[in-house]
Amino acid sequence: MVILRKTLIFYPTNSAQSIMQTINPRSPRPLSTSFDRSVDYDIVVMGGAFSGASNAILLKREFPDLRILIIERTEAFSRKVGESTSEVAGCFLSRVLRVGMHMNSKHISKHGLRMWFHNEETTTPGRSTEIGPAYQGRLPTFQINRMTLDTELLLIAESLGCEVARPATIKEFDLGGIGKNTITFKSETGGETRTVTAGWLIDATGKAAKIAKERKTWRSLADQHPTSSMWTRFRNVTYLDSDEGMRELDGVSSTVLAQRGFSTNHLMGFGWWCWIIPLDSGEVSVGITWDSRLFTPPANGTMSERLKEHLLKHPVGKVMFENAEAVENDNQYYKSLAYWSDEVTGDGWAAVGDACGFMDPLYSQGLDYCAHSIYGALALLRDHYAGYCVKDTIVHRNQEFKRSYFNWFNALYKDKYWYLGDAELMHAAFLLDIGTYFIGPVRLVYTDQDSEFTRMPYYGPTGRFFARFMAFYNRRFVTLAKKKITAGTYGAMNSDQAFLITKSFNPDFSSFKFVIKGIKIWLKLEARLAFTPAAQDAMQPSVATPLPQAGQYRHA
């Protein structure tokens, strides 16, 4: 057992010395001579995008003598859905990868998360209820063009001495154990097929999750969280901070001093939400995520037409997208978003990023998840290359990942789509979810990147306590949403309200004030709806419930 910052972290005793010696993992050091290096490469990374390139960068910075091969399928990274980061990923990019200059010069700084609600009384966009910050955020967060970021990171990895094979297709691989792995891949330019040996294989193949599917450890979470997404890009979008946008938002335009257009704007509804992310190109990434138990988006037309039809049913969406044009052949659809793997590491291999699993994009924590998995793999490999036995660490990492995944899911996302369309409930959830995020994960990674990125969130005694508290209020909010449906008051506060955050969330215990405020709103709702039965089988439309809209609401 090792004590770091008065925090108890349980690691195998034979790795304790290495942890104490690697408080700064970026300090270059020699490889141990205690292992066989007769393989062709010390490490082969399958996938050269964010997770694969990041892992290679961190390993080469610490062990410059490592022979690393990165196999990337594409000749050039394609345009991907625009991504928004939250504060943990912002810390990873700026303080761990140390690409802050690139992020600030090539991507858009994010002005927080902003949610927009409406009901049948919302006759103008300016009457839409808004949840979000009144000022700019204090910590670095970004609206990311993934094609640009992935390209930059792979170039950095190559400049550090990593060999890159692209475009190349992985034909097969054999997980023979540490120092006994083989992988066969084909160059798509010369047509040459190569088989190489590797000390370790890193799976950074994203949702393809090659190792998990090969080992049959990939698991869908569709039985508990049947969400899907479709998205596209639009040009000629009316920004909320433009002259036309400000005029349309008359009545609320002066209440926010930050630029709304640089927030990640979410349009909210029962069983669904839409993201709106500005990109450096001037285009806008737009998508919808929905719970198929509750909602189905419009069915007719192309994907872009279906998405635009839905957007125009929301007053704020209509302002922004009425004259917008979809970018041709630039849309995607994913069914059953949530999945996980029983194993994230083993004898001579490790998975990172989306190859480990994915939950939900609502709070933009996808790269948080990637950051922790990348750093966990780094910690494992640096122990190995420093000469320590990692058998017990492998067992620990697999246990930690699974428990963290479900603690995280139950705390934030289980059945949450029941109350996404109610501004009053989401106001309480916003304060509680983000308040606990700053008190826990954000505070910890800004205090000690090395130990905290190594650990998965919501794990350990304190993490479990917060996860249980969050899962409890999440369950209560689901029940309260059903009670509101019965009472005919679901969405009653979706017009003419401004739930603005006028004091910043800070990565310290001062953010408890937001948690306390959220609890007060919650308890008032419990008292008001104490004797109201919860709806069971179906939405019961009322004047205040925004039904119908584009798409179809389903029996729940």
Where on the chain are the PLM-derived regions?
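Beta1/beta-strand and adjacent pyrophosphate-binding region of the FAD-binding site
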Residues: 37-49
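Predominantly flavin-linked oxidoreductase catalytic cores and closely associated redox partners
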Residues: 160-308
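Glycine-rich FAD pyrophosphate-binding loop
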Residues: 60-81
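N-terminal FAD cofactor-binding segment of flavoenzymes
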Residues: 78-121
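Short beta-strand to alpha-helix junction loop
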Residues: 135-155, 297-299
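FAD/FMN-dependent oxidoreductases across multiple families
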Residues: 270-272, 278-280, 292-413
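N-terminal Rossmann-fold NAD(P) dinucleotide-binding loop
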Residues: 52
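C-terminal helical "tail/cap" subdomain of flavin- and related membrane-associated enzymes
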Residues: 379-556
